[in-house]
Amino acid sequence: DRDKDNFITDIPSYLLKIGIQINGTYKVHVDKRHNLWVLQGQNAFYFNFSHKTLKTFKIENFPEETPELSISDDGENLYLLWNSTLLKLENNAKKCKRVDNISLPSNSIIEKHIYTDYHGGIWLYSYTDEQIFYKKNIKSEWNQIKLHSKIETKSNAVRSILDDSNGHVWIGTDR
């Protein structure tokens, strides 16, 4: 709780205070604008901390349990990736749509994670190896990114991808 400079550990009670009632398993994501997204079952909740407003989205054909779900945002929209399905929640339109025109690379990424950068680029990576795929925008082709071969580490498995306001992309590996 930033207003009270307090660390909250009872998340369900806090969510209830802001109008989000959850039962069972849920996922939480804080977006690039520091707003809260909560996903549970076929519902997505968006809480804007600055305006103290809550939006609710219905995600049709979304499985109730998605333990392998990866979440990212581009500052406006939320992207949900699981198995070989990519969904985009359009915050301004208050709707969810399946991004069918994006075919995910079938190369040997076993466990896919997604990161969307500030410029609309989409990054896929795995915690288990150094494979990285990048798409400049939804309409462009996938490019496989190779990490510099002179990096001397025992493992280049990608742990995270972030970009900064200067346009630099930072790729975190095991070592």
Feature annotation, model-predicted:
Residues 1-175:
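Carboxylate-rich, polar loop motifs that coordinate divalent cations or form catalytic acidic clusters
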